[in-house]
Amino acid sequence: MSIVCLESLTFGLGHLVRAADALGERLTLLTRDRSYYTYELDRLPADALDVVETETFDVDGLTALLERSPRPRGLISSTDTWTLVAAELAERLGLPGLDPAVLRLTRDKSAVRRRLYEAGLTRGRAVPVTGAGPETAEAILKEPGLPAVLKDTAGTGSQNVWLVRDPAELDAVLAEAAGREFRGRLFAEPYFAGPVYSAETLGWDGRTRLLGVSSRLMSPEPYFREEITAFPVAFPEPRRAALERWLGDVLAAVGYTDRFAHVEFVLTADGPEVVEINPRIGGALVGEGLCRALGVNVYEALVEAALGRRPALMDAEPPGGPAVAFVLGYPAAPGVFTGVAGLERLAGLPGSPAWYPVRAPGDLVEHLADSRGYAGIVYAEGDTAELATHHAVAAANALRVLTEPAGPTSAPGPVPVLGPAPDPAPAPGAAGEGGGGGADGG
């Protein structure tokens, strides 16, 4: 093994294998369950990489495994869940890697907000939420005020995020949150209104390069469920350059100045505001879109960075390719996923649309207000991101995600791919924020 990948995103493993091969390296995937990567593994030769099933949260066990000969030359981690495990593992093995303290900071959303506020890069502060009573509600009404977002400091996959627009919603959300388990702690911050985007950046030695910006079309309030993504957004050059400078300042403020970053932000009437900083390449089909739209295998930069080398992509001018877009396919009712109707129609539609499955028949779909609920992704291309979006939406509209009741009280149904998320809980505003595919945040 020369390059080790500690788990991976649902999509992109094939690109990573080909990137390692192009650079003369052999990829080994460490995973708790190889079946999670069935889609990608089925499309690779059997000997394309080594797959080792092991407990990937056990740092001691992983260290012992990787200290055996031959030792790896680099370690890749592209998921939120294993970010800190990978950082500790790289440190133990003496491999090129990022400062674990920086990665811990990026995984704490309230700490990121505080750091950006201190640097003058956000107008809002993070306020801890320590209870559910009237005194807590009163404190939130004072700061950050309404509308506000309440969320988990270490949340992922769009879970445990609430939009609060009035005092009644605040009381309901505090009551609901009191019964939830959090990966971190609950905090409040201002709700920044405006279109949502994600910046796909690559950094090295303090310089940040903006590879492009993805649009994020969201479900109606109070939900934060992602519906459609397109890349690259066609910003006028002065605005693109200003965004690149701002992103460089944002990432420098948290000390994350090397490797890929996926920065979600809102373009408010008063300028950009960070939603969250992800120290990795984007999930879902963002990596696929980068490869196709830029005309290069961006995963070579992942391998080069893991080896401690300046990625060639920092200085290259990619040849370019088609713009891309994808639609997340959600059921409108929970239940057992049974398949997708209409896939045979995709071949006759413009934009070379394709269905990328995330769930297998028999999987239970329980949560529809965040990214846990989608069954797959409809991908399409176009001459511009706008045209690619039209193609992807037309293809998604030709499909029906099929579910059947999981129990006697469940609603059956063929259901539309698109549409607002139903309210899954008594409290208004229960929602996810951000999202991604597979392990994007998983």
Predicted segments — roles?
Residues 49-57, 126-132, 164:
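Short acidic-hydrophobic, aromatic-tinged amphipathic segments that line or gate anion-handling sites
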Residues 91-160:
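A conserved helix-loop-beta module that forms one wall/lid of the active-site cleft
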Residues 65-72, 143-144, 180-181, 254:
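Glycine-rich phosphate-binding loop signature in dinucleotide/nucleotide-binding domains
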Residues 190-256, 260, 267, 274, ...:
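ATP-dependent carboxylate/phosphate-activation module, predominantly the ATP-grasp catalytic core
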Residues 129, 161-166, 202-204, 268:
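Short beta-strand-to-turn element immediately C-terminal to the catalytic PLP-Schiff-base lysine
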Residues 1-102, 359-364, 369-373, 381-400, ...:
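ATP-binding N-terminal substructure of ATP-dependent carboxylate-amine bond-forming enzymes
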Residues 303-442:
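Peripheral (often C-terminal) accessory segments that flank ATP-dependent C-N-forming ligase machineries
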